[in-house]
């Protein structure tokens, strides 16, 4: 076995991970080498990248253009039995148990796939705080998957690589599938499985890059809250005075777009922790949606798409130009890029102080919620546990139309502990920091159109500069929300959602429908006193 390294780091032994007769290990290659490897003329199928006119390489991920939560499993053993938020028939989630025996079979499959091959190994960190970060090792035979990992995790220095020991290993066997899936009692031949005792993730059958990123997020969501540290599906940025804001929201609600703000420095766009020192990024890159991307509306993200960025599932014309408006492969077109592709970032480490503004983003497909409302501490817990939004087309396999959904903590797919644990840790951090919370609807209203990005940016500006605190307010019934009646730079006719309907009764009937869904969803949290006490903070029907 030869080890080709673009670092001074010591050679690595992959036999301890179960790999045999590996031909060559390419460890932490440079971006130049990855570019050459992923565009090689002899590559075929999903391995082959094409160079676009912007300089970024574009790849296709096949039938999996989003995560496949139905194929996610976790080994149930002494490590996980007590703390893991296991799925139940009454409250289903994505944490489905498998036995050690099934794991052993799947591990054999993946190690067979990667053994005897030339493999890429990327060693990196998940978490900008050295005290709580996970040292991650990803092993793959596909160059662009190594590129994705290099973009998305925190890149170690040569000194750190020399003594690097992984806390968690990801083995990506995208080319292999499990033919014994029925016998194993699994959902399909594809799999994304975790073993917290072995501290390993195995991937088979899916080429989608996000499985590696979100897999490690799920692990941070397990380890950190047990130490009293908030682990959050949010973006974060910092103002010139050092004030920190965090934005919660599911895919497509505007986390990346709204936190990438020329007036503020970006801490990160998707995954963060909040400890005694403040808010810190888990990642070393961004993973932005590119559907309908334009230079005018989102200049920072557009300008980040250059050499070393990696596009997924976009339509590339023969001349190398990109049709960002084409969602024929998927609405979930993406780009990953190292965070330094955004000019205005917090340096040298992606972390800030304690947050003083917490923003919940919802894309309301019903057209009921106000564009912005200020939340009481009880409403904060209620809406955090509810995690309402509309699932937008194509962000998960099998979802094609906007449908309303409730996702606990704005990230139920990535939670590995009970949702109330995250709410408890977040609200404790907010109370200690004196942070205010706001619910922002980036979705639709009675006009049938999506609220414009310009109006939403105006709302965010008013929250961040404090002018929303000076604005006169009115009460919106059913949801019992306080909304401003005017904000600088925001169309005043949209602030009360009832005003966007020709007939206000139409809003009322939709609001009652949505309120009932909130109430039905929240019932699962009312099996204890804390949950029961929050019911009054949610929508009320007479």
Curated annotation (Swiss-Prot):
Q: In which pathway does it act?
A: Carbohydrate biosynthesis; gluconeogenesis
Q: Which residues bind ATP?
A: 214, 233, 249-257, 298, 334, 450-451, 456
Q: Which InterPro entries match?
A: PEP_carboxykinase_ATP, PEP_carboxykinase_C, PEP_carboxykinase_N, PEPCK_ATP_CS
**What's in the keyword line of the UniProt record?**
ATP-binding, Cytoplasm, Decarboxylase, Gluconeogenesis, Lyase, Manganese, Metal-binding, Nucleotide-binding
- Tell me yes or no: is Metal-binding among this UniProt entry's keywords: yes
- Organism, per UniProt? Vibrio vulnificus (strain YJ016)
**What's this protein's function?**
Involved in the gluconeogenesis. Catalyzes the conversion of oxaloacetate (OAA) to phosphoenolpyruvate (PEP) through direct phosphoryl transfer between the nucleoside triphosphate and OAA.
Q: How does it assemble?
A: Monomer.
Any one GO MF annotation of this record: ATP binding
Annotated positions binding substrate: 67, 208, 214, 334
Q: Where does Mn(2+) bind?
A: 214, 233, 270
Please verify whether the record's keywords include Lipid metabolism.
no
Q: Per its UniProt entry, which superkingdom is the organism in?
A: Bacteria
| Protein's UniProt name | Phosphoenolpyruvate carboxykinase (ATP)
**Reactions the enzyme catalyzes:** oxaloacetate + ATP = phosphoenolpyruvate + ADP + CO2
